[in-house]
């Protein structure tokens, strides 16, 4: 129901006040009036991002990254599509962050519904209990930023039908017709079966994705970048539960659940989205793997190479394709480096800027310590304890062992002469 419909309803209620019981109608009118306020507060869509620093511009702080030289063109973020699988503690927060960043298109996947037990996860509200997580996410995210295109899929990707729908949606054209496929997949699921399904889909499509997870004790987590053929897939070095073939659902016990801290979820979601932004907007260093241990504030990193004997045929095929294209990539990288080096030689040492900061070539200056003397660098009445560079004397050569032997012989003769007398 839009704002105009609500106002029409208010007019109808005003007309009904002629009835005998106006109190009930007044209460109804107050409830509807409360619905009009948020409807009026929702902003309209913004066509172009602006760097103008005004209170009414929701993108001014984001565009400042471009002005400060962190990102070349931040507005490119509107051209990208990201799929988030799992709208739980990490996925829902990641979706909110990307929405606030102004991502162009978000695809949301989950089959679960919102429960009161989810209220510690920073995102869902008690009034959304009973809604599917995807619908609840769309409801909240569309209010935060109406510029983002949101597509929700309430399905279980581990089923045959769900996997087919998931695979097709990753390749399909967006609802507005602007994008085809997705640029990145974020896995925020809480079980290994779903991770293996995401791994299979991305290997088949050659789709880059990032995996995330939080430990059962809620005090540690990780994120990982997976590029089919270039890095290890999830099946190249599977966890023990996956490698042993045990159905992880049989490991769960009645009345026992994993711990969940909103702080850890928020940290992992932040690391995940930060890595995604660096990957898409080409700034900083994209982490291949980054762990997080909150007990020791420890952030381990590592790289994982693909396993040539991986059990996933699609992964092995992507590895072959990656190796076949390696000479062309190396040649392109070399040409790019040479072009950048040539451009650097032609450009000035520094560009004009608003802060009057200049970069001075060290070769054009002389170190002040070489020009200064011992007298001009100290106040009157003070002298240097150590010699200056101009008055430095070569150290006395050490006495050789032969001279020491001669002195000992002379001393012995003197002692013998004294004893004889």
Swiss-Prot record:
Residues that, per the record, bind ATP: 89, 110, 133, 156, 191
Binding site for Zn(2+): 233, 236, 310, 315
InterPro entries: D-isomer_DH_CS1, ThiF/MoeB/HesA, ThiF_NAD_FAD-bd, Ubiquitin-activating_enz
Keywords assigned: ATP-binding, Metal-binding, Nucleotide-binding, Ubl conjugation pathway, Zinc
Gene3D superfamilies: NAD(P)-binding Rossmann-like Domain
A Gene Ontology BP annotation from the UniProt entry: protein ufmylation
Coiled coil location: none
Pfam families listed in its UniProt record: ThiF
Record-annotated active site: 257
Similarity section: Belongs to the ubiquitin-activating E1 family. UBA5 subfamily.
Role played: E1-like enzyme which activates UFM1.
PANTHER family the UniProt entry points to: UBIQUITIN-ACTIVATING ENZYME E1, UBIQUITIN-LIKE MODIFIER-ACTIVATING ENZYME 5
Full protein name: Ubiquitin-like modifier-activating enzyme 5
